[in-house]
Curated annotation (Swiss-Prot):
Residue positions binding alpha-D-glucose 1-phosphate: 99, 164, 179-180, 197
Gene that this polypeptide is encoded by: glgC
A Pfam entry, by short name: Hexapep_GlmU
Gene Ontology molecular function: ATP binding; glucose-1-phosphate adenylyltransferase activity
Name used for this protein in its record: Glucose-1-phosphate adenylyltransferase
CDD domains: ADP_Glucose_PP, LbH_G1P_AT_C
E.C. number(s) listed in UniProt: 2.7.7.27
UniProt xrefs under PROSITE patterns: ADP_GLC_PYROPHOSPH_1, ADP_GLC_PYROPHOSPH_2, ADP_GLC_PYROPHOSPH_3
Length: 404
């Protein structure tokens, strides 16, 4: 029987998420609710746990209370075999300063690595929507002999200029890591596609420690994993790209194989929700062989009364739709839509109340928003613009606890 390598998972969850405002006004970006029953961090944690990586440190910083609480309440492991998922707030172990970048977060947390003494370290971001089996990426990393492996997703070359792009040879070795190039490189097998970094990395431990320490001594560095650490290792010939297309998740459909979304803007966050609602969704939440674990509240089932209906929609537990119409929408837990109300193409987070005869279209309503009887959101954008955030794509975003 092959001895399993000793692996430590580190999840970078300190992001402020300014482009998701107002959803990040009171919480860290990884704590933003998603998909009716989850928070963004649940996707990366589910991927790691499903692959049996059960020693995980979640590095937090910005407005982390709800994130810390979510992890402690919903991600308890047994601990009997040294298993843990633990949030680690910025400790200021090296002086009175916060993290200045993702690489600095690792530098200030080197004690976690020394304590665990792993063979390999998985460093993943906390704010993407996807399924992935990290064990397959780990096997690629070990077999390639690289010191660092970057998960790369293929995008059309014509769209790649907005991302960090990877130029690799046929073996997967990275020749150059280029941030937002005007002329993106093609992949070795397709000149019309480009490898884009997913922000997920695997390192051989000594390679990471040496690179992190060298970066910390560099006064000209921004101390960023993608912007500084990976280019440093690329220059030394030590980095490889893992093709996400080759990742085979148990139970994945042909439609959602290779699905990955960066939901860092309101429009991207909205579009990712719309990927969930069709009969055959672009991203399937119902894969029992690779489950996404989320909130574990003990809630009653959703209820539809007085002819209330929901079509092409996701409706969370505890929600009640009474003589109302819901279409192409995602409703989280404990949402109430009252008589005669219409909700179309919208995302309603936990505890939202839609009053009698109200209309909500093309909108994101954060927790505990109340839309009064007869009120309208997303119908008159000029009026909405005076009081709410509106994305470039015309999505109206209403912050937590607002009464309309």
């Amino acid at each position: 029987m092959r001895e399993l390598p000793h692996v430590l998972g580190i999840v970078l969850a300190g992001g402020e998420g300014k482009r998701l405002y107002p959803l990040t006004a009171d919480r860290a970006k990884p704590a933003v609710p998603f998909g009716g029953a989850y928070r963004l961090i649940d996707f990366v944690l589910s991927n790691l746990v499903n692959a049996r990586y059960l020693r995980i440190c979640v590095l937090t910083q910005y407005k982390s209370h709800s994130l810390d609480r979510h992890i402690s309440q919903n991600w308890r492991l047994s601990g009997l075999a040294g298993e843990y998922i633990t949030p680690v707030p910025a400790q200021q172990r090296l002086g009175p300063r916060w993290y200045t970048g993702s690489a600095d977060a690792i530098y200030q947390s080197l004690n976690l690595i020394y304590d665990e003494d792993p063979d390999y370290i998985i460093i993943f971001g906390a704010d993407h929507v996807y399924r992935m089996d990290p064990e397959q990426m780990m096997q690629f990393h070990i077999e390639s002999g690289a010191g660092a492996t970057v998960a790369g997703i293929r995008v059309p070359r014509s769209e790649a200029s907005a991302f960090g792009c990877i130029d690799a040879d046929e073996s997967g070795r990275i020749r150059e890591f280029i941030e937002k190039p005007a002329d993106p490189p093609g992949t070795p097998d397709d000149p019309e596609q480009t490898f884009v970094s997913m922000g997920n990395y695997i390192f051989t431990t000594k390679v990471l420690i040496d690179a992190i320490r060298a970066d910390a001594d560099d006064d000209h560095s921004d101390h960023d994993m993608g912007g500084d650490i990976i280019p440093r290792l690329v220059a030394d010939g030590m980095a490889a790209v893992y093709d996400f297309k080759n990742n085979e998740v148990p139970g994945a459909t042909e439609r959602d194989h290779g699905y990955w979304r960066d939901v860092g803007t309101l429009d991207a966050f909205y579009d990712a929700h719309m990927d969930l609602v069709s009969v055959h969704p672009v991203f399937n939440l119902y894969n029992k062989r690779w489950p996404i674990r989320g909130e574990s509240e003990n809630l009653a089932p959703a209820k539809f009364v007085n002819g209330g209906s929901a079509q092409e929609s996701v409706v969370g537990a505890g929600s009640i739709i009474s003589a109302a119409s819901v279409r192409n929408s995602v409703l989280s837990s404990n949402v109430v839509v009252d008589d005669g109300a219409i909700v179309e193409g919208s995302v309603l987070m936990p505890g939202v109340r839609i009053g009698r005869g109200a209309v909500v279209r093309h909108a994101i309503l954060d927790k505990n928003v109340v839309v009064g009887p007869g009120e309208m959101v997303g119908v008159d954008l000029d009026k909405d613009r005076e009081r709410f955030a509106i994305s470039a794509g015309g999505v109206v975003a209403v912050g937590k606890g607002v009464w309309i």
